[in-house]
UniProtKB/Swiss-Prot annotation:
Residues 199-259 form the KH domain. GO terms for biological process: mRNA catabolic process. Residues 325-418 form the HD domain. Belongs to the RNase Y family. The keyword Transcription regulation does not apply. Its main location: membrane. This is Ribonuclease Y. It comes from the Bacteria. HAMAP family: RNase_Y. It is an enzyme of class 3 (hydrolase). Endoribonuclease that initiates mRNA decay. Keywords: Cell membrane, Endonuclease, Hydrolase, Membrane, Nuclease, RNA-binding, Transmembrane, Transmembrane helix.
Length: 509
């Protein structure tokens, strides 16, 4: 009995559990169905709202596009109306002009008819008068015409000869006046400093006490300047002053700069002098280049070889008849440019030719040949314009002038050279004499350098110790004496000194 009850309870519990599971599943299903329904409703609601928003935005964009289209259409319509109105105005103007032209044409036609009638009447009257004249003069028309032409011709020839003579005199007077005006106008526009070259430089001293140090023990410092620098150091009673003397302006400038630097440094001795001379020589090369660059910049000259620029700078240290060649060349360049401007010619080419016309003087003391020939060679070497080359070749009438610019440069050169005080022949002759002495010395075998000092009355021959021995010094001295007697005229006594010095330098580490 108890077992049956247990079995029944077990069966009942199983059935209850199954029913519970089924009910739970049904409840869960119903709950999920409701949740899904709510989600569907929510998504549907959001989709409807999005649809409404999209439609609203679409309507708004369509409305804006429509408004924009209407405004654009209205503007285009207004523009078309304006163009149409302008075309109508132009059309009306053309119609009025056409009417005016037609009216003028009608008046011209009427005038032509009237002129033809008058011409016909005049021809008739002319025939009548000719007939009357022929009857009165017993000459035909052709005979009277020939007589009249002959009389007029004779009278015209006399008047023409008189007119031509007067015109020739007037043209000659005007051409001379115009030429003078051109040159005067060019000279008025040019301002160039007058520079006369000296053969000495003055060095100011802080005190006279330095003179003894400059002289050195037994005069060795002054000897060093003579032997190495090729200049004379002149010390006299003038207070606080030392004079550097040399006909060669480049050597004089190097020595002056050297002495000034040594005075600042305070150490004045032969070795220091030699080193400083070499240093100042290098610095002067830089100054020469800078001078050339500043010159072409001043004259606004472009596209020029740097080596040619250096030669231009070198002219600063060259003189001709006492006139500084660079200053003279700049003056000729400016005068040439001004005259070319007055005549309507190429100003830049005239300035360039004027500057380079004496470029041969930058090397004529180093090479054989006239400055004209050397200058033309330099210009050809650096590919200058043929007109510029001809200006160099013809400014002293060595060659025929091939252009107006060549004539202008020659005129400007003459103006610059002929100014009062521009040139001094005595100085140039002195420099030529000194140059000739140095050339003679340098031509002797074994001589490395020659220095002409004190107007040529002292000559220093520096011998190359590797080429000439002590035994050769007497022979070199005799050779120099003989050459000087035959080729150079110098009044008074001449002292010739031959110096052979050899130095050995080594560095001990």
């Amino acid at each position: 009995m108890n077992d049956d009850i247990i079995i029944l309870l077990s069966v009942f519990c199983g059935i209850f559990f199954i029913c519970f599971i089924i009910c739970s599943s049904i409840a869960l299903y119903l709950w999920k169905s409701k949740s899904r329904k709510r989600l569907v409703e929510q998504y549907t609601k959001e989709a409807k709202q999005a649809k409404k928003q999209i439609l609203a935005n679409g309507y708004k964009e369509i409305s804006e596009a429509k408004m924009l289209f209407l405004k654009r259409s209205e503007l285009e319509k207004n523009e078309l109306d304006r163009v149409k109105e302008q075309l109508e105005l132009r059309s009306n103007d053309l119609k009025r002009n056409q009417e005016i032209v037609e009216s003028k044409s009608q008046r011209l036609d009427a005038s032509l008819l009237d002129l033809e009638k008058r011409k016909f009447l005049l021809d008739k009257k002319e025939e009548y008068l000719i007939k009357v004249l022929e009857d009165a003069s017993s000459l035909t028309k052709s005979q009277a015409k020939e007589l009249l032409i002959k009389q007029v011709k004779n009278k015209s020839e006399k008047e023409l000869i008189s007119i031509l003579k007067n015109a020739e005199l007037q043209a000659h007077s005007n051409s001379k006046m115009i030429a003078n005006n051109i040159i005067i106008s060019a000279m008025e526009r040019i301002k160039v400093e007058l520079t006369s070259q000296r053969t000495t430089n003055i060095v100011k001293l802080p005190s006279d006490d330095l003179k003894g140090r400059i002289i050195g023990k037994d005069g060795r410092n002054m000897k060093a300047f003579k032997q190495i620098g090729g200049v004379d150091i002149v010390i006299d009673e003038t207070p606080n002053t030392v004079v550097v003397s040399s006909f060669n302006p480049i050597r004089r400038e190097i020595a002056t700069r050297t002495l000034e630097q040594l005075i600042i440094d305070g150490r004045i001795q032969p070795v220091k002098i030699e080193n400083e001379l070499k240093k100042q020589e290098q610095e002067l090369e830089y100054i020469i280049q800078e001078t050339g660059l500043s010159t072409i910049k001043e004259l606004n000259i472009n596209d020029i070889d740097i080596e040619l620029v250096k030669l231009i700078g070198k002219l600063k240290f060259r003189t001709s008849y006492g006139q500084n060649v660079l200053a003279h060349s700049i003056e000729v360049a400016k005068l040439s440019g001004a005259i070319a401007s007055e005549l309507g010619l190429d100003v830049e080419k005239a300035i360039r030719a004027g500057l380079l016309h004496d470029i041969g003087k930058a090397i004529d003391f180093e090479k054989q040949g006239s400055h004209v020939v050397l200058g033309a060679e330099i210009a050809k070497k650096y590919n200058e314009d043929p007109i510029v080359i001809n200006c160099i070749e013809s400014h002293h009438e060595d060659k025929e002038k091939e252009s107006e610019i060549a004539a202008i440069v020659a005129i400007a050169d003459s103006i610059s050279a002929s100014r009062p005080g521009a040139r001094y022949n005595a100085i140039d002759e002195f420099i030529l004499r000194m140059t000739e002495i140095e050339k003679i010395g340098n031509s002797i075998p074994g001589v490395a350098k020659t220095y002409a000092l004190q107007s040529g009355r002292q000559i220093r021959l520096i011998v190359d110790p590797l080429v000439a021995s002590d035994l050769d010094l007497a022979m070199i001295l005799e050779k120099m004496k003989e050459e000087i007697k035959n080729k150079v005229i110098i009044p008074g006594e001449i002292t010739i000194t031959v110096i052979r010095e050899r130095k050995e330098t080594d560095v001990l580490k």
